[in-house]
Amino acid sequence: MADKEATVYIVDVGRSMGECRNGRSVTDLEWAMQYVWDRITGTVATGRKTATMGVIGLRTDETSNELEDDVHFSHIAVLSNIKQFLMPDIRKLEDELKPSKTDKGDAISAIILAIQMIITHCKKLKYRRKIALVTNGQGRMSDEDLGEIVKKVKEDNIELVVMGIDFDDPEYGYKEEDKDPRKAENETLLRTLVEDCDGVYGTFEQAVAELDIPRVKSVRSVASFKGYLQLGNPEDYDSALRIPVERYYRTYPAKPPTASSFVLRSEPEAGQEEAESSEAAAATQKGSQSGDIGLTTVRTMRTYQVEDKSAPGGKIDIERDDLAKGYEYGRTAVHISETDENITILDTFAGLELMGFIQTDRYQRYMHMSNTNIIIAQRANDKAALALSSFIHALFELECYAVARLVVKENKPPVIVLLAPSIEPDYECLLEVQLPFAEDVRTYRFPPLDKVITVSGKVVTQHRNLPNDDLLDVMGKYVNSMELVDADEDGDPVETFPIDDSYSPVLHRIDAAIRARAIHPDQPIPPPSERLTKFSHPREDLIERSQKYLEKLIEIADVKKVPPKAKGRKRTRETEKPLSGLDVDALLHHEKRAKISPNNAIPEFKQTLAQAENIEAIKDATKQMMVIVEDQIKHSLGNANYDRVIEALGTMRDELVSYEEPASYNDFLGQLKDKLLQEKLGGDRQELWWLVRRNKLGLVTQRESDQSRVTDTEAKEVSLTKMKE
């Protein structure tokens, strides 16, 4: 479970925050809110109820706080008490955080008020407490009772963060020229306060510059297995090894947030609102939390029906409890009773049993089949830690891996895992990955890359398909010129692309887009951060350095550009000339094909279309294929010819779409279905039409071809029309 958090943001909205300074095109408040919105939306995106926030407005026109009777707390407004933030709260906060008409208000008093809010909300419970002050340092600040503030912050373990606009920061290397004396005095006051509280003090130049750095989410690990690592059967042998261990993820893929479906909420009919279920009410509440009260979540309702000719409509409804579990075998649902199903379940007990050992040099890394996990000793068990440490060191010294059988939970299927020792200065563990069973391994033999073996068994090392020495030499130089590891002044290697600077573009781009839309729903989504796109293209210096080797490689390898594939009607386009410049058809004296042979229908159909000079020739070829396909169906013994028919239909569909004649295919498919419905092609052929639907060989729609007049709805109706009972 994640730690509870309570954060209070103090945002300076004084009149001076509405001005643009130091050549910026945005106001100080707009510039500062980039940081505030980034932190708030990042917390909202977690969806955790334990991640709470509050917002205080500093130097506001009005005063609204529990200490407003004290003059020191004037022009300070609590815009939101500490709570879980949702989309409506962000919308409300966006409207309230506007520059005021006054510069009165004390930032130190706002910090005192934030401390009081945290104490009231958190009480003595375990929370991660934090106060973040965002200001430009203008106006008056009181330096009274700073010692008491520091004492209270440390007592309640509150982290104090002060982010200042144009604040001097020697560590970051920023200094504002011609600084106002009062602002300089306020900066010194805030810096002293933060340093005494062991907090964080920084300038917005650094904070805004680091906003495009994706934040990697830290996740608290949860044990996926708790049991015993054992060698031998402890029930039969006293010498058996048995160590209490725990298993955690070492690596796990992060996934972007999934989409949710919403619909416009309709007004309930009379009497319907009272009968609304608790589930529907919860869904409605969730829709309102999304920030738009006009939306509600999509709710799924399933009904089960069976055919009954005596019932109205030919079907009757049944309850889910009356259904029996079945498994698909081909296109047949096979029922297995609960008694028979228990036979197929392997009775297993949770545990990690050692099966054997293997030398490290005999293991191939391509055998990995899963993410990496770690095995550590049971927590707070010194005896188990000592025993596991001895086992880890034994594997390390003998250069061995252990092979074990893992059952995570009782009656779960077992898996075979590899255990590798990992020893660091202050940390030891076993790295665990899943291995394949013998039946999972598929062995394929490929021809060698450095030689050619003829039919007679002769080995040839000089061949047109093998690279010569010159080509290998140039390729080696080209690869070396693209080396990503540079050298420093001492000649030591320096990694140009450190793995820690590599982020998932999909994950962080979606996250940034969601947060941008949450803050500014009517503005376009900003472009992706350069940190996400810099690995999508090579560096300029690498391109320049390798260009001469690339040109030499193209010359020696005799690389030629393939002509681009022409678009448009195949029948009106010129025949592509081969690179050799020779007319192959003229050399072979190919004559135009007049009739398509049923024995070689598909290749001859393609050839006929390629030689067609007008639409009539295309239609004639299509009619010939129609006759051949119908003849194959009519004379098919059962489903013997169905595969040939499906292949022919697929070829006809693709070719006629590419020749922009989808109407010919649609007409043929409509005629074919009518004949199948009337059983004119050798009796009942329902299975064939099912294959047509499964292979998505239905009508060509307008979405697939501009020449088609069939809509998606019409194509679906034709496809789903039931065959004759």
Swiss-Prot record:
Provide the leader sequence positions. none
The alphabetical list of record keywords is: ATP-binding, Chromosome, DNA damage, DNA recombination, DNA repair, DNA-binding, Helicase, Hydrolase, Nucleotide-binding, Nucleus, Telomere
Where in or outside the cell it occurs: the entry states: Nucleus; Chromosome, Telomere
Q: Which CDD domains match?
A: KU80
User: Where are the annotated segments for Disordered?
Assistant: 259-294, 704-725
Q: Superkingdom of the source?
A: Eukaryota
Record's catalysed reaction(s):
ATP + H2O = ADP + phosphate + H(+)
Give every Ku domain span. 229-481
Protein EC: 3.6.4.12
Q: Which GO terms describe its cellular component?
A: chromosome, telomeric region; Ku70:Ku80 complex
Which PANTHER family does the annotation name?
Answer: KU AUTOANTIGEN DNA HELICASE, X-RAY REPAIR CROSS-COMPLEMENTING PROTEIN 5
Subunit (UniProt) = Heterodimer of Ku70 and Ku80.
Q: What is this protein called?
A: ATP-dependent DNA helicase II subunit 2
What organism is this sequence from? Aspergillus sojae
Encoded by which gene?
A: ku80
